Amino acid sequence: MASLKDMRVRIASTKATQKITKAMQMVAASKLRRAQSAAEAARPYAEKMDQVISNIASAAAGSPGAPVLLGGTGKDQVHLLLVCTGERGLSGAFNSSIVRLARERALALMNQGKDVKFFCVGRKGYEQLRRTFEKQIVENVELRSVRQLGFVNAEAIAKKVIARFNAGEFDVCTLFYSRFKSVIAQVPTAQQIIPLEVEAPAANAGPAPFYEYEPEEDEILTRLLPRNLAVQIFRALLENNASFYGAQMSAMDNATRNAGDMIRKQTLVYNRTRQAMITKELIEIISGAEAI
């Protein structure tokens, strides 16, 4: 049995851990508000831009001058999985849920005879994926030194992806990230970004409105598609940022509660042990007095 001193040390250690987890919970809560506002503000712009480009793409469908980013290479043999995760842990299942979705997609594609490559954004995703797919990871971008996410960070990633696409390294690119829903709910999401997925009009939608574009649709798409790619990546990074702080806040709250339960149990054991030792000493004193 542990001595009373060991028990006191253990209780003090648990209390110190509880203070740390409580502080981390409060920091995550304060950062979550700003991150959530940024993610929610980026959604309408990203969704509307995707919709506008989809409308223009529908008008340019079949055009011989359509950008390759729109129609793709015409093949789907080589898939690039752009996996965006966090730089830090202590956030529950935030990182592992994104990696799990990407891993499941990779295995499904490989079972179909496809070639799979990984482009990792974030240290945690890279560390998990390299255990299984180290030879298939073509690039890893870390944002550890970035104090505040900006569009320039997403634009740099988009340029790297486009450069690899233009070099013929892949046919299809899918973006993986965690969509922020609430503090306790983050949804792992997969979104195809190359080639652009154009939604077919509904059967009962009626005649589509006619638009004239100036300049021509192909020229507009040539300019907007790289921009849209950066916008979608930026949105994913902002969603991830909010999801990370939401998951961390929830995880640290659970850790703080668990530490409180441990402290109560340890204190109960300590008090019972101390009481038993005092009772034993009293019995020994009384027995000695009676013997005299």
Swiss-Prot record:
It is found in: Cell inner membrane. PROSITE patterns: ATPASE_GAMMA. Pfam families: ATP-synt. Keywords: ATP synthesis, Cell inner membrane, Cell membrane, CF(1), Hydrogen ion transport, Ion transport, Membrane, Transport. CDD domains: F1-ATPase_gamma. Disulfide bonds: none annotated. GO terms for molecular function: ATP binding; proton-transporting ATP synthase activity, rotational mechanism. Produces ATP from ADP in the presence of a proton gradient across the membrane. The gamma chain is believed to be important in regulating ATPase activity and the flow of protons through the CF(0) complex. HAMAP family: ATP_synth_gamma_bact. NCBIfam families: ATPsyn_F1gamma (TIGR01146), PRK05621.1-4 (NF004146). Belongs to the ATPase gamma chain family. This is ATP synthase gamma chain. The gene is atpG.
